[in-house]
A protein has these predicted regions:
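Bacterial Sec-dependent N-terminal signal peptides
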Residues: 1-21, 357
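Asp-box/BNR beta-propeller loop motif
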Residues: 20-29, 57-80, 113-131, 162-182, ...
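Short glycine-/Asp-/Thr-/Trp-enriched loop segments that recur within the blades
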Residues: 29-36, 81-88, 131-139, 181-190, ...
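Entry beta-strands of beta-propeller and related beta-repeat scaffolds
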Residues: 45-49, 97-101, 148-152, 200-203, ...
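Conserved blade-ending motifs and adjacent loop-strand segments that build the rim/top face
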Residues: 277-280, 314-328
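Residue-level detector of functionally pivotal "anchor" positions at catalytic/ligand-binding pockets or at interdomain
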Residues: 350-370, 398
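Short, glycine-anchored, charge-dense loop/turn motifs used at functional sites
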Residues: 392-398, 418
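C-terminal tail/sorting-segment detector
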Residues: 417-436
């Protein structure tokens, strides 16, 4: 095992760096220069994105595009919400049929809110008339942790942040009490689609450079000051992403990077190296890995790049315009592009193996078993990352299915060698377990 891990570590630095990374496919938006400002990836087959006008973002677009075949083809559709002046700020997809959107007012006197589709985007309905109804209400972000639990964040209203949670699949949303959220600073607001999540933890960023953080799906919040003064200003802006509940990265519009290992409470500037550079727009950690992808859309500083060591060393991928970037794991990831008259552009689909060559190493860092060999009890670390545990004998027969837990009982099983199949967001791996 140790030799294998050492070989995996060495492989991190010996990949073919010229391997293909992106495959550009048609986003199916009908108008040229339509971009994708936000992705929501459900699984390796299903992902949704929302469109925007790449020539003049002030020209409102109410459109989505969706794939159900792992990004090979995308089908665009209109978001019919009954008012063409409302903006589509963020999207949270549940499956190929169901998705939620955060809708914001673009004209004074109107109200946004939360809309939902249950027929693949064919029709959209407002959840209720009770959320974001004040004159200053402005929904910014929406995220679902699973099919039942979600959170929507908005700007402050009457001196308090307007945040709602749901635990019933979006049938009802409950306001988070002001006592559970640190008070806003003077003129502080949030930003459209500027949130990131890992497990039960979620973060959103603000106009004063602060980062709000919840560890319980939005029910309670803490706030930390970041190294920058604004996450969406004309002079200073930034983006954040987290690999897990603690490890994160912050990228500024000047391509300066900061890292955190305590969920964003403190940040340390990264001294970068390598032949490439991070870009100044969006950044994405691949969950539970050391891999990061950075993208930029500024025509004077456009492109994409990646790092395999938490943002220290960078390799350039291309110099095309990229908007949003999102990864589910080491095999499913997308970046937003723009449509063209050739009907061949709009979505960058990850097709390489650059970010999967070190899966064994990343998996080993995420999960550990001890003691191994064992008599009866087997302890497991990193259970917050475990989706499923199943024990097999060497003949391939399933013996036990465990609920994710810190301790697994092998009592009643004869001594011998077994295989524990562990499923995490990184994929599946079978680890030998010896019972004495």
């Amino acid at each position: 095992m140790n030799k294998f891990l050492l070989a995996s570590i060495a492989a991190l630095f010996t990949w073919n760096l010229q391997a293909q990374f992106w495959s550009e496919v048609d986003s199916d938006f009908p108008t040229e220069s339509t971009g994708i400002s936000r992705f929501s990836i459900v699984d390796e087959n299903v992902a949704w994105g929302i469109g925007y006008n790449g020539i003049n973002p002030e020209n409102n677009i109410q459109q989505f595009s969706k794939t159900t075949d792992a990004g090979s083809t995308w089908n665009a559709g209109s978001i019919g919400i009954g008012n063409t002046n409302l903006g589509i700020g963020d999207i949270a997809a549940i499956d190929g049929q169901t998705a939620f959107i955060a809708v914001y007012p673009r004209i004074a006197g109107q109200n946004g809110g939360i809309w939902k589709t249950e027929d693949g985007g064919g029709s959209w309905a407002k959840i209720s008339q009770t959320e974001f109804t004040s004159s200053g209400s402005f929904p910014n972000t929406i995220h679902f942790f699973d099919t039942d639990n979600g959170v929507v964040t908005g700007d402050p209203v009457n001196g308090n942040w307007e945040i709602y949670t749901t635990a019933d699949g979006g049938s009802t949303f409950t306001p988070v009490p002001a006592a559970n959220i640190p008070a806003p600073q003077t003129n502080e607001t949030g930003y459209l689609a500027q949130n990131t999540a890992s497990g039960d933890s979620i973060w959103f960023t603000t106009s004063t450079g602060r980062i709000f953080h919840s560890t319980n799906r939005g029910l309670n919040w803490n706030v930390y000051q970041s190294p920058i003064s604004d996450f969406g200003g004309s002079e200073v802006s930034g983006d954040i992403s987290f690999a897990d509940a603690s490890k994160g990265i912050l990228q500024t519009n000047a391509a300066i990077l900061y890292s955190t290992t305590n969920a964003g409470q403190t940040w340390t500037q990264i001294v970068t190296s390598g032949t490439g550079t991070p870009y100044g727009d969006n950044i994405a950690y691949l969950p539970f890995t050391s891999y990061i992808v950075s993208v930029g859309s500024d025509p004077n500083f456009a492109g994409s790049s990646y790092s395999v060591n938490d943002g220290v060393t960078w390799v350039n991928i291309d110099t095309k315009q990229h908007v949003d970037v999102a990864f589910l794991n080491t095999s499913a990831g997308y970046s937003g592009g723009f449509t063209s008259d050739t009907n061949t552009t709009g979505v960058f689909k990850y097709v390489g193996d650059v970010l999967s060559a070190g899966d064994e190493f990343a998996f080993a860092k995420a999960i550990s078993l001890y003691p191994n060999p064992t008599r009866n009890e087997l302890n497991i670390s990193g259970t917050d990352r475990v989706l499923n545990l199943e024990l097999f004998n060497l003949s391939g027969q399933s013996l036990k299915v465990f609920q994710p837990s810190h301790s697994l009982s092998l009592e009643g099983l004869p001594t011998g060698l077994y295989l524990l199949k562990i499923t995490t967001p990184l994929g599946m791996q079978s680890i030998p377990v010896l019972k004495n």
